[in-house]
Amino acid sequence: MDLFSANELMWAAFIIGNSAPLLFIVLYKKQKISVELLNLYFLGVFVGLSWEIPFALAGKSFHLILIDWPIDLPLVRNITYSFIDGLIFIVGVFLAKKFLKTNDFLYRFNSKALFIMIFWGSFSEFLVDLNGNGKLWLFIENWYNPVFITINGNGLTIIPQLIWSVSYTHLTLPTKA
């Protein structure tokens, strides 16, 4: 049984995704959130763009779009999904801060924070694909993107699952100041 139709999911993604950056900017301008939180949100957006744009450019050899988007311009859907990725990233930061009782991981490498962020990113990606794959898009199974699990006839492929792990690991590599 599906909780949401493809059309309902598409409109939810469209509204939430395109409202999120505006909300963060307004909250910052009204001094309700810090510049740090605003920057973390947009860092998450840029993390999302690092795979949303390549997914779009890969085209039909990698995935198919199954539903028309309200604004049918190149990359609009992918940019909107990146705005949602920013929200997912912020939740990961919140979870790491909650479990670790500190935000030091934002300034220096912390393997526990990395684990929390990777776990959250992978779990959220799994839920997103479980609900969106086969309704909004369809990832194509091939030699470089095999199906790792099938649930109710929905084959989830490996590359979308690995994305958050690679992104978070890259983001948290220690750098010299």
What are these regions (language model features)?
Residues 27-39, 102-109:
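Membrane-interface helix-boundary motifs at transmembrane edges
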Residues 102-122:
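Internal alpha-helical transmembrane segments of multi-pass membrane proteins
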Residues 43-48, 115-129:
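Hydrophobic alpha-helical membrane-insertion segments
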Residues 79-89, 152-168:
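Hydrophobic alpha-helical transmembrane segments
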Residues 44-60:
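A generic, lipid-embedded transmembrane alpha helix
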Residues 1-17:
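Hydrophobic transmembrane alpha-helical segments in integral membrane proteins
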Residues 1-4, 60-77, 137-152:
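Membrane-interface interhelical loops and short amphipathic "cap" helices
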Residues 169-175:
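Conserved small/polar residues in nucleotide/adenosyl-binding loops
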